[in-house]
């Protein structure tokens, strides 16, 4: 390609510290000219990726300046016409990692919904979104390799491992980095529960039981409340906030 796309927040001092208004710039290697293609948007514009056929560019975009927890949307632009489109409207959550499909007609992305980060397929013909994976775990990062997607997967009971995911959702574990350790441990059951809040809404909570839990016995309880509140309590694995250790 004769063009390079990059993201930058061209501000200094206090304005740089409090603003989230970054933009996508395209530098032409032949003319040495730089063009801002997201100047009208006032929030974060990040992670530009060209389509395999070179006809489009996709990027993540937040709408409002100074609001770093804004909805992370997915946009594409037709490089010939300059037409831009908000393509992830059908997914009412953040678009996290994403990658173009080989045919440039599909974008695969990860996103959290109901406490799980799954892999989704976005059909650019009609902007419809379909979940490829399901289950009580999180996928993070996604790359295309042939006819499969390569991604990290973890849960509250397992640290990161690498998986190959077929486009029909069939996942094959490629790494077993901690198998010897897991074989010596017994993990407690993890259960999702929906609770009605004081304002009448439904809230997802996670219950992590001790290993060898006996329902006839009483156990001390620890309540973990997520701070931020810029991230959900999904099926994340943490060496600092490890729920299996807390439950044990």
What residue ranges belong to the model's regions?
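Short loop/turn segments that connect beta-strands within beta-propeller blades
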Residues: 28-32, 78-82, 123-127, 166-169
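Residue-level detector of Asp-centered blade-edge/turn motifs that repeat once per structural unit
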Residues: 52-53, 102-103, 144-146
